[in-house]
């Protein structure tokens, strides 16, 4: 099963599904689109595919962003649908359908709980690549976890059940996967180019993404940041008041972590299906 969140990008999603249809062979693939309260409609003409088994849409009432849409999709699929593995992927073309075969091959060979798509090449410009590298380094330093993947993963049914045992997946998908599965299989992935329009990932969104991942490991972060604050506080006391600047920055960082941690809430995750407005079956073989 493939899970695709979408907000006002129907043209890209249906192009992706057409490409998925052309890249799968004997696999039985059902696709679930999570419509994150899109304000734009899509062409409702009956879609036809040669290999895909079915396509359905879960329409949400309120927009919550891709991470909450994916969490809602996982929760719905776990409680209502039959599947062996589920693959969340972005609907804009940046997660390449050509790499699905690599997921399928690993599933058939070793039946791992989790497979992640490790980025070995990105398609963005130099500035974004540089900032993304800073994000990975910062996350690694502050959490002790080196996260090289995004939403594009392959999860067994047991892995989905484990992810849904706490609220961390409501906060950060990649952070939650890393938290629950320290060891996982990987495939190599090249970041594709968007089918239509510019990337929606701004610098601010990247910073927020980094902070959310960090918040998943808030207990570890709290200890590390408090130690750093104390060290710079002592340096400020015995050496120079300028050392108060990084100490204050540490307190500000902890404040943001505490605020973001409010989304790490199992109650919100357990109640997320109340945000489903309707279900639509748009294709079935």
Feature annotation, model-predicted:
Residues 1-5, 59:
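Short hydrophobic beta-strand elements that form part
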Residues 8, 36-38, 64:
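Conserved short acidic donor-positioning loop in nucleotide-sugar-dependent glycosyltransferases
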Residues 9-23:
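Short, well-formed alpha-helical segments that are part of the catalytic scaffolds
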Residues 28-38, 58-60:
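Short beta-strand/loop segment that forms part of the nucleotide-sugar
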Residues 35-44, 93-94:
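A conserved acidic beta->alpha catalytic loop
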Residues 61-62, 66-76, 85-88, 94-171, ...:
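Acceptor/aglycone-binding surface of glycosyltransferases and processive sugar-polymer synthases
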Residues 107, 161-220:
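Catalytic donor/gating beta->alpha subdomain of glycosyltransferases that bind UDP-sugars
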Residues 222-285:
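Membrane-embedded multi-pass helical conduit in multi-pass membrane proteins
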């Amino acid at each position: 099963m493939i899970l695709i969140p979408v907000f006002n990008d129907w043209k890209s999603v249906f192009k992706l599904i057409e490409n998925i249809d052309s890249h799968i062979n004997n696999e039985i693939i059902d696709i679930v689109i999570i419509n994150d309260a899109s304000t734009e409609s899509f062409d409702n003409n009956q879609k036809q595919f040669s290999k895909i088994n079915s396509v359905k849409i879960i329409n949400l009432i309120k927009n919550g962003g891709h991470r909450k849409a994916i969490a809602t999709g996982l929760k719905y699929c776990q409680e209502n649908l039959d599947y062996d593995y589920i693959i969340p992927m972005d609907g804009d073309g940046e997660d390449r359908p050509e790499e699905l075969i690599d997921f399928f091959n690993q599933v058939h060979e070793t039946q791992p709980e989790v497979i992640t798509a490790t980025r070995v090449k990105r398609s963005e410009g130099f500035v974004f690549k540089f900032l993304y590298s800073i994000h990975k380094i910062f996350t690694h330093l502050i959490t002790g976890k080196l996260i090289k993947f995004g939403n594009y993963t392959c999860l067994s049914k047991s892995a989905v059940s484990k992810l849904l045992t706490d609220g961390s997946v409501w906060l950060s998908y990649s952070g939650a996967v890393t938290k629950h599965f320290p060891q996982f299989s990987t495939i190599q992935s090249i970041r594709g180019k968007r089918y239509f329009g510019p990337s929606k990932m701004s610098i601010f969104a990247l910073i927020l993404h980094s902070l959310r991942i960090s918040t998943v490991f808030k207990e570890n972060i709290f200890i590390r940041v408090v130690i750093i604050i104390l060290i710079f506080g002592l340096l400020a006391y015995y050496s120079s008041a300028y050392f108060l600047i990084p100490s204050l920055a540490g307190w500000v960082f902890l404040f943001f972590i505490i605020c973001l941690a409010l989304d790490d809430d199992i109650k919100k995750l357990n109640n997320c299906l109340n945000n489903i407005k309707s279900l639509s079956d748009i294709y079935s073989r």
